[in-house]
């Protein structure tokens, strides 16, 4: 019998983790205070793994695992397949069960267990079929475990294989670039993504290559410039001239990021187009937050400070309006193509927030008139 082999559309880091540009440290369990050991006398027992499955043979375990997986009961599927792998090493289903156990653990988010199973099947150098698919999934598990260098090594090997299709090589190279981003190697990642797009542009018949991964490469070029944009802080204490230089540089990075996101939208992939629209609106919203929270430079006199605030409010209103326009166009496009993903919901929430800010700004303009 064959393994389950779902499509290998498991893109590393559709990665909403990049929304903050920060990674989270893993929590470690605290060791409990040691207590004096109590001695309990018990009859000797024999460890049999999962006693409830002990009566099932390998055929029954494999069939039950397939049924559980089809019913989306991935924890049960993992139990059946793991039992077969651990207790029936001579089964004709051993290889398929090993791969399927990895799939079930992956679905459960148990990436350490998924990695241990996929590693037994994966062959990134020469594998085909499940061995090739397992290599991609092995890298995926390593990514989720934060072992970026190990994932990059596998994906580099896959991306260099001449026997793979152009789409498979592009997938490996894009996922390598995402791992480089997460590993903080932005320059290396930028070079990787640019090579992907150059290779895609040189493809004789791009219609035969799924645009998902090239669009992801373009999107992550935007992400790299967005991360660089976020790294530039605006400190009014350094003086008006230096603040103006930093603001100009920050605006240049914003426009560079926006340029890559706009190229994604022109590529037409509906997932990454929606994501890019959300990101563009977010850039303007972010710059708005920077400006509105930035204090007036200390060197300005009171009259100069008042003029500064007035000019700042004009710029802020422009940014809010731009964000609203981008968010609205993004939602219109998403509705037109039927896109449904986390970026769509976040766009709706951001649009509502920006509209509320614009209304609040208009009410400030009305206050003097009301007073009169």
Regions found by a protein language model. Name each.
Residues 4, 24-372:
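Acidic, polar-rich low-complexity tracts and alpha-helical solenoid repeat scaffolds
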Residues 2-14:
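Bacterial N-terminal signal peptides that target proteins for export
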Residues 13-23:
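Bacterial N-terminal signal peptides
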